[in-house]
Design a protein with these regions (language model features):
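Short Fe-S-cluster ligation motifs
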Residues: 2-4, 53-78, 90-107
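Iron-sulfur cluster-binding cysteine motifs and their immediate structural context
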Residues: 34-47, 65-79, 133-142
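Polybasic, low-complexity binding patches
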Residues: 77-91, 147-153
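Iron-sulfur (Fe-S) cluster-binding modules
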Residues: 1-19, 150-155
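Ferredoxin-like iron-sulfur electron-transfer modules
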Residues: 9-30, 43-63, 78-83, 113-124
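Short cysteine-rich clusters marking metal-coordination/redox-active sites
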Residues: 29, 68, 125-127, 136
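Short histidine
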Residues: 131-155
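A short, structured beta-strand/loop element
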Residues: 33-45, 101-114
């Protein structure tokens, strides 16, 4: 999928059965592969459709979706099972040579105050080169972005 296709606002794919709906928003996906490794019988990037919601239980699918650090994957339970939980506190994790992963009650607003995104998981650009700012689009790899080693406190 080209960058132009990936970053179209409002493009979303939906994969459903009677128990769960998996939503995928390609503009936020940075292909960490967490879903593929967690549940290959459901998530297979070489298959079409690439999400097969009949490949595992709704509980297993929900667990795998929650491993997506960008929130590109999210789910809705139709079977009365638990919906995505709101994290109790917001955390920000630096990825070496990569984005900031934010988990929590995230609300991103533009300079004019309009809400760009409300989510529980996002990956924010740190390199300054994303064409999907403020979100990471993997441009850090193209430009060779490197983070500095943490300063030693002498201990």
């Amino acid at each position: 999928m080209s960058d132009e296709q990936r970053h179209r606002p409002n493009v979303e794919r939906e994969y459903r059965n009677g128990e769960i709906v998996v939503h995928w928003e390609p503009r936020y996906c940075i292909h960490t592969g967490n879903c593929l490794r967690a549940l290959p019988e459901v998530f297979d990037r070489d298959a079409r459709p690439w999400v097969k919601v009949d490949g595992a239980t709704a509980d297993k699918i929900a667990e795998a979706v929650m491993l997506c650090p960008t929130g590109a994957l999210h789910y809705e339970r139709l079977d009365g099972g638990p919906q995505e939980a709101q994290p109790e506190q917001t955390t920000i994790t630096e990825r070496p040579n990569g984005p900031l992963y934010v988990r929590g009650n995230v609300r991103i607003t533009g300079p004019d105050g309009t809400v760009i995104r409300e989510a529980t998981r996002v990956a924010l650009c740190r390199c300054g080169h994303s064409e999907n700012k403020p979100f990471c689009d993997l441009s850090h790899r193209k430009v060779g972005f490197r983070t500095a080693a943490p300063a030693s406190d002498g201990q």
